[in-house]
């Protein structure tokens, strides 16, 4: 799995929670609760949407901030696909759709330096 930054560990430490306390707040069960939190913090696994939303509730930060690296990767992929779709649909008469695709394609555009 690629190394993508997330901010779970720093937010947990700012909140003074232990991994076991976060695991309890997440509703994790089993012997390795703290280990599951550690794997999320180290990006050894991608948490479920339910778990990601629970992290948002615990730390009061949006998912896209807590998982910034993953968000940027996904946003770039969506932007690339929007460019392709926009090109494919360039001959369509639906200007609203074309405008929406163009905006999506440019939303996460990062010029190559």
Indicate where each model-derived feature is located.
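A short, Lys/Arg-rich alpha-helix, primarily the initiator
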Residues: 1-15, 106-113
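Residue-level signal for the short linker/turn that defines the boundary of a DNA-recognition helix
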Residues: 3-6, 16-17, 32, 47-50
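Short basic helix-loop element that most often maps to the first helix and adjoining turn
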Residues: 5-27, 79-91
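Conserved hydrophobic/aromatic packing and binding residues within compact polymer-binding modules
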Residues: 8, 19-23, 34-40, 66
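Recognition helix of helix-turn-helix/homeodomain-like DNA-binding domains
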Residues: 27-47
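DNA major-groove recognition helix of helix-turn-helix/homeodomain DNA-binding modules
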Residues: 48-65
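Short, charged recognition helix plus adjacent turn
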Residues: 57, 67-113
